[in-house]
């Protein structure tokens, strides 16, 4: 089902200073969360920095703007019914708390990783506050199907177009219209693949449609994905790999970011290069010169043995640092010098 693009009168994106009465906060120091490092690092593809240090996006079928100070995480929620304008409720704050998994002490994890890994210790000094999001399994699955042979900017565009075409319209802020993520029935509908190809998803369009149909027709629906949260890591990974378009790396992304498997270590070319360059790692069970299912498992075990049960979280810190460094290297020297302080925690 395609959703209409007709727009009604819009609200504006809020900032903490423009409408302080509509914000609420959670105690959260920057050492536990850095929004700029977490929301733009390829975990979720639905957040934009609409004004300086204010990130707007969709979470749990609501539109939010987030910002932070040195010790508080602030949020505001835009509700479609203008009669419901007000500060975020306790339930909404709990949704945000769970999304960022704030029950997990990042400071303690960093301390442990630094104690067993001198390279991590040197990197972490400048990249405090990188933690894993706990995402909706359906959104995470189809977002990472779009990630195949892709980069963050292009994935973000694909996911946004998919939501605009097949997701429910939520609210318009300034000139930006926000949509919820499509459900499985919307993605399994007739002509979906053709439409997604027109939207630029290429061969991934077939995988999106086929995986949605497989979950609905062979696995019994979205509850199957939710149930993988209580399955073992190995069981969940194996189950995900039965879906069209899901290989070992995509399955590890979903396990780590949506299915409560903090030991999952997604291996792409970035992580492969980090392992070779910074750890001198070489595969023993495979002669491959790049990521492969067998080598990925071996490398994942290497990092799990090094970092422990939250190995996937530690990998995310190094991935974010490597990504930020690559982005800086592409900037013109003048801009790099001007913005260099922003890369340090």
Curated annotation (Swiss-Prot):
Protein name from the UniProt record: N-glycosylase/DNA lyase
GO cellular component: mitochondrion; nuclear matrix; nuclear speck; nucleoplasm; nucleus; protein-containing complex
Binding of DNA, residues: 149, 154, 204, 270, 287
Organism: Rattus norvegicus
Gene Ontology terms: biological process: base-excision repair; base-excision repair, AP site formation; cellular response to cadmium ion; cellular response to reactive oxygen species; DNA damage response; DNA repair; negative regulation of apoptotic process; negative regulation of double-strand break repair via single-strand annealing
PANTHER family the record matches: 8-OXOGUANINE DNA GLYCOSYLASE, N-GLYCOSYLASE_DNA LYASE
Localization: Nucleus, Nucleoplasm; Nucleus speckle; Nucleus matrix
Active site: 249
Keyword annotations from UniProtKB, A to Z: DNA damage, DNA repair, Glycosidase, Hydrolase, Lyase, Multifunctional enzyme, Nucleus
Family: Belongs to the type-1 OGG1 family.
């Amino acid at each position: 089902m395609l959703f209409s693009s007709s727009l009604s009168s819009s609200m504006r994106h809020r900032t903490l200073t423009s409408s302080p009465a509509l914000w609420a906060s959670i105690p959260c120091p920057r050492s536990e969360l850095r929004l700029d490092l977490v929301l733009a690092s390829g975990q979720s593809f639905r957040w934009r920095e609409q004004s300086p240090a204010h990130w707007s996006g969709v979470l749990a079928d609501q539109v939010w703007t987030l910002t932070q100070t040195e010790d508080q995480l602030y949020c505001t929620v835009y509700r479609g019914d203008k009669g419901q304008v007000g500060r975020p409720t306790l339930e909404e704050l709990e949704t945000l708390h769970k999304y960022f998994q704030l029950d997990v002490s990042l400071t303690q994890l960093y301390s442990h990783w630094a104690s067993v890994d001198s390279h991590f210790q040197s990197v972490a000094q400048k990249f405090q506050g990188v933690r894993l999001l706990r995402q909706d399994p359906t959104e995470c699955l189809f977002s990472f199907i779009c990630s195949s042979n892709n980069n963050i900017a292009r994935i973000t565009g694909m996911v946004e177009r998919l939501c605009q075409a097949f997701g429910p319209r939520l609210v318009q802020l300034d000139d930006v219209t926000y949509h919820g993520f499509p459900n499985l029935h919307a993605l399994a509908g007739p002509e979906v693949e053709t439409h997604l190809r027109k939207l630029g998803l290429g061969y991934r369009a077939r995988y999106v449609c086929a995986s949605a149909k497989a979950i609905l027709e062979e696995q019994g629906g979205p509850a199957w994905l939710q149930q993988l949260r209580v399955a073992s890591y190995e069981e969940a990974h194996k189950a995900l790999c039965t879906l069209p378009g899901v290989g070992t790396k995509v399955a590890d992304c979903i396990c780590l970011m949506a299915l409560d498997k903090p030991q999952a270590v997604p291996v792409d070319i970035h992580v492969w290069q980090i392992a070779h360059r910074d750890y001198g790692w070489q595969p023993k069970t495979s002669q491959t010169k790049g990521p492969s299912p067998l080598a990925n498992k071996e490398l994942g075990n290497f990092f799990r043995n090094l970092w422990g049960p939250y190995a996937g979280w530690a990998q995310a810190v190094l991935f974010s640092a490597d990504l930020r460094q690559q982005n800086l290297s592409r900037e013109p020297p003048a801009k790099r010098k001007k913005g260099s302080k922003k890369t340090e925690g």
